[in-house]
Amino acid sequence: GINFNDQERGRFNYSSLGGLNDAFRNKDVINGIENAPFAFGSLGGTTNINTRATAFAAGTKASVAYSNRSYNMRATATHSTGLMNNGWAFTGSAVWRWAKEGIIEGTFYNSWGYFLSAEKMINDRHSISLATYGAPTKRSQSAAVTQEVYDFRGIYYNPYWGYQNGKKRSSRVVNSFDPTVVANWDFKITDKQNLKTGFGFHYSNYSNTALGFYNAADPRPDYYRNLPSYQINDVLGSYGLECTTEIHHEN
């Protein structure tokens, strides 16, 4: 196998699989530093995902699901030929997840995912395989807010969106796409010896938008200076309230 952990964080980015559950079911999970037949163990555990087309049973599966979470609808289809008489095996899977607005205000979701795998059993000792997958995704984010904001606006409040020309627009939009290609050559030397050679290509693309307000007041509605607690607890804020109250009484 080939290690596809992120080079910066040291972890695997599962969002790159993009909801392709049926395509990545064939896996082995090893906990801790226990010895694994496919890699050295690690403190966080080790997972090996088998993408060879011969690992999938022949058949077709399609499903549609509805949700009220990050996305509203999910459609997926998977087809596998199994190992055919000519020594070839093919598997393909596709998924689409979408939401005009999720359960959190101002969050949309649009994600596609694809998986293609081909394998050729040359003879009893040699086989070659090629697999590719990716999940181009565009989604908007929600923010973590304080209990004070939740008390005023509810648990689904999200300060990252607003109206522009009468339409909802999010200031935090994520675009991600991690296309990956994996090629393998298996050589059975003897009944007890196997040589496995792999080649992998992985390209990571991740971008995130945000409001720019350099040298200007923070425009976020949940900015702490805009909350009642700041006016009540801050010394200058309390002084301002007292002055305002006095002027109001004088009028």
Where is each model-derived feature located?
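Residues that define the transmembrane beta-barrel architecture of outer-membrane proteins
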Residues: 41-43, 65-66, 71-75, 108-112, ...
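Outer-membrane beta-barrel channels and translocator barrels
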Residues: 83-86, 121-125, 190-192
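Structural signature of outer-membrane beta-barrel domains
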Residues: 4, 67-69, 97-101, 135-140, ...
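Acidic/polar loop-and-plug regions of large Gram-negative outer-membrane beta-barrel proteins
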Residues: 119, 127-186, 207-251
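Transmembrane beta-strands of outer-membrane beta-barrel proteins
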Residues: 58-62, 88-92, 128-130, 195-199
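Short acidic/polar hinge/loop motifs at secondary-structure boundaries
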Residues: 4-31, 52
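Short strand-turn segments of transmembrane beta-barrel domains in outer membranes
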Residues: 26, 34-36, 46, 51-81, ...
